[in-house]
Amino acid sequence: MTPGELLPSDGPDHVLNPDRRTLTLVIENGGDRPIQVGSHYHFAETNGALRFDRAAAHGMRLNIASGTAVRFEPGQQRTVELVDYAGDRTVYGFRGLVQGKL
């Protein structure tokens, strides 16, 4: 065994966020710079150059592994899956649009 080596099991694949509501949206970067969004960023509050239904994304984040991100190149369109925030569903910071309960 090498330090840091991963030994995957023969069991079923790990499922991210089971039993939580998800939403699939098409996102377009209408800006002239790349935009990267992290796994736990409140998606409705992302950079204004990203074009999508922000009301539908309220209270949701990317349904990707913790600590990872998705990058949107200028002019790029991509489909992403969002997932509801869990826990007490309280959001502070980001662009300051919520500052409390979702």
Curated annotation (Swiss-Prot):
Q: What GO terms are given for molecular function?
A: urease activity
Q: What is its EC number?
A: 3.5.1.5
The entry's localization annotation reads: Cytoplasm
Q: Cite the InterPro entries for this sequence.
A: Urease_beta-like (IPR002019), Urease_betasu_sf (IPR036461), Urease_subunit (IPR050069)
Question: What superkingdom heads the lineage?
Answer: Bacteria
Q: Which reaction does it catalyse?
A: urea + 2 H2O + H(+) = hydrogencarbonate + 2 NH4(+)
Return the GO cellular component terms, semicolon-separated.
urease complex
Group of enzyme by EC? hydrolase
| Record GO biological process | urea catabolic process
Q: Which UniProt keywords apply?
A: Cytoplasm, Hydrolase
Query: Self-association or partners: how does it assemble?
Result: Heterotrimer of UreA (gamma), UreB (beta) and UreC (alpha) subunits. Three heterotrimers associate to form the active enzyme.
Cross-referenced NCBIfam families, in alphabetical order? PRK13203.1, urease_beta
By what name is this protein known? Answer: Urease subunit beta
Classification of source organism? Bacteria, Pseudomonadati, Pseudomonadota, Betaproteobacteria, Burkholderiales
Name the gene for this chain: ureB
